């Protein structure tokens, strides 16, 4: 778990669910890590199970390096990699993403702080910001 005086916020869901839009609104003045940007920075485009696990660990490590609040935005298909985040926002706005392999491996969360089912989510962003 992150330091008690900082929140690590995970925005996760299928491709096309609105993760990046939500995360950018939330992270206006916060450190923000987008999956595609991080993959580009590390030149790591491995989407196998092992590649996705490596990316999940990398995203959490980057968020923790800030020693402050941070927002992380990525698919995070495996439930086990979501537990370390303080706030978990599931973008459950679509039933299927663009990629069949991702749809098949994506595990519904055992727990999330917020479940976003439509694009009227400004109240959720405000609620999270109040905690910071």
Residue ranges: model-predicted function:
Residues 1-6:
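Phosphate-binding P-loop
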Residues 11:
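Hydrophobic anchor at the beta1->P-loop junction of P-loop NTPases
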Residues 14:
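P-loop (Walker A) phosphate-binding loop of NTP-binding proteins
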Residues 17:
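ATP-binding Walker
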Residues 20:
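Walker A/P-loop
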Residues 23-64:
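Conserved substrate/cofactor phosphate-moiety recognition/catalytic segment
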Residues 49-97:
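Glycine-rich phosphate-binding loop used to anchor ATP phosphates in small-molecule kinases
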Residues 84, 91-132:
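Small-molecule kinase domains that catalyze NTP-dependent phosphoryl transfer to phosphate-bearing small molecules
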């Amino acid at each position: 778990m992150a330091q008690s005086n900082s929140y690590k916020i995970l925005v996760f869901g299928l491709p096309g669910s609105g993760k990046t839009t939500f995360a950018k609104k939330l992270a206006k003045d916060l450190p923000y890590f987008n999956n595609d940007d991080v993959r580009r920075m590390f030149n790591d485009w491995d989407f196998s199970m092992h590649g996705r696990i490596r990316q999940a660990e990398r995203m959490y490590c980057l968020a923790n390096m800030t020693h402050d609040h941070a927002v992380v935005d990525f698919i995070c298909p495996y439930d086990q990699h979501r537990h370390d985040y303080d706030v978990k926002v599931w973008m459950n706005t679509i039933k299927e993403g663009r990629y069949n392999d991702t749809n098949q491996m994506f595990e519904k969360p055992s727990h999330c702080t917020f479940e976003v089912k439509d694009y009227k989510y400004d109240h959720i962003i405000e609620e999270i910001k109040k905690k910071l």
